[in-house]
């Protein structure tokens, strides 16, 4: 071997190592018996490329349609698409350690401290307790004037562009309305996007930050995250820090205010007085991180739901039925409030079916099987395996839902669940808000905002889809949240 140079020996060694890993992953790995596409079982490279392309949700859905409800999507990761997996992975089981979120997928914030999104069991409970009141029924009642204010302002702004004969790009308007609302609820002041008729730049930063996080994750998993400043596209550089800078600026202004503001921070600030010496509040760093999380979770998810509802109602000819329910329930617009819209069963069914076909958070970070391993869907899974449930994989599976590719709000009505063809639907597989102690804390707020805003729009306007300009709205990429394409709707003022 003396005639071989060191570079050649190094290259040969690398080839042998890669081949060994491929063979091991396919034939000797503890997960070798799980089905899945060959290249994905052999190497994590296809998974990483798919993550970077933003097509993970569609690829997982396709793999589940091919291989069934349990698919090996990386050498050390399994994706599920059934109701049992939600319970086995996410539900609290006495005496069993929690399946924590993958720390590689969700690293700590730039300041190195935790948030409600990335925290251990004890600290997550503390964060959730502090924010719990703001998302309770009592908290929602206190927040109703704020939610209604921005729904009404959206109606006012849309009157300016209605009846023109031209379709309106609604993603922008929904983003402005919900971002303003979540600004008021999060920091006690709006971002004034609707009043200025201009989307706040933080929204663009959020999307670019999440895309940069995906790139950083791939580099981190390869042990070369230090190359991120050199490999990150220019438009994404610094977006993570910029995202936190916005949160810092808004939080500082909020903390300068005295007395209750009727927002998410009232209880947190009281509990965190005197530098959080008692330990049951939050440190300043934790406040910053949670502020950034709340803005993303509270704005993008709700605006996505509104976009999905209006698109699917128009696309599948369900708009007339939804309009009839809303207009039949109210003699005047001022009768529309959070309590009254919660009594509209078809409107709620529309939201539920939208979240099945277009879940607000389509890509969730996997959980890590705790020490000692665990039983998932009747099979033992070794410790340190990554496991998760694919929303779209479960929701579009014909073995879970009849006519899974059709928008049928009726399937969510109480009586329909007992009748054909829906009585065999597996509703346990449908968990858009997740389950367990880490389910979405903002679920009630999201329902309230979507119900109220959608009801007001359907009461005031006749809405139809500009299919030629919109195309297939559901054909979108994701980087944690949807990279929404444009949604063009024709808006006409209702005739009385």
From Swiss-Prot:
GO annotation, biological process: sterigmatocystin biosynthetic process
Keyword list, A-Z: Heme, Iron, Membrane, Metal-binding, Monooxygenase, NADP, Oxidoreductase, Transmembrane, Transmembrane helix
| The UniProt record lists the keyword Cytoplasm | no
GO molecular function of the protein, one example?
heme binding
Its transmembrane ranges are 3-23
Superkingdom, taxonomy of origin:
Eukaryota
Lipid bilayer topology: Single-pass membrane protein
Annotated pathway? Mycotoxin biosynthesis; sterigmatocystin biosynthesis
Q: Which InterPro entries does this chain map to?
A: Cyt_P450, Cyt_P450_CS, Cyt_P450_E_grp-I, Cyt_P450_sf, Cytochrome_P450_monoxygenase
Query: What cellular component GO annotations does this protein have?
Result: membrane
Pfam families, per database record: p450
| Cofactor section | heme
Q: What is its EC number?
A: 1.14.19.n5
Reactions catalysed, semicolon-separated, are: versicolorin B + NADPH + O2 + H(+) = versicolorin A + NADP(+) + 2 H2O
Q: What induces it?
A: The genes forming the sterigmatocystin biosynthesis cluster are co-regulated and induced on oatmeal porridge or the fungal isolates were grown either on oatmeal porridge or in YEC medium (0.2% yeast extract, 5.0% corn steep liquor). Expression is positively regulated by the cluster-specific transcription factor aflR that binds the palindromic sequence 5'-TCG(N5)CGA-3'found in the promoter.
Q: Where in the cell is it found?
A: Membrane
What happens without the gene? Impairs the production of sterigmatocystin and leads to the accumulation of dihydrosterigmatocystin.
User: Which positions in this protein are listed as binding heme?
Assistant: 440
Any idea what job this protein has? Cytochrome P450 monooxygenase; part of the gene cluster that mediates the biosynthesis of sterigmatocystin (ST), a polyketide-derived furanocoumarin which is part of the most toxic and carcinogenic compounds among the known mycotoxins. The first step in the biosynthesis of sterigmatocystin is the production of hexanoate by the fatty acid synthase (FAS) units stcJ and stcK. The polyketide backbone is assembled by the non-reducing polyketide synthase stcA by condensation of the starter hexanoyl-CoA and 7 malonyl-CoA extender units followed by cyclization and release of norsolorinic acid.
- What is the similarity comment for this entry? Belongs to the cytochrome P450 family.
Question: What name appears for this protein in its UniProt entry?
Answer: Versicolorin B desaturase stcL
Q: Which organism is it from?
A: Emericella nidulans (strain FGSC A4 / ATCC 38163 / CBS 112.46 / NRRL 194 / M139)
> Could you read off the lineage of the organism from its UniProt record?
Eukaryota, Fungi, Dikarya, Ascomycota, Pezizomycotina
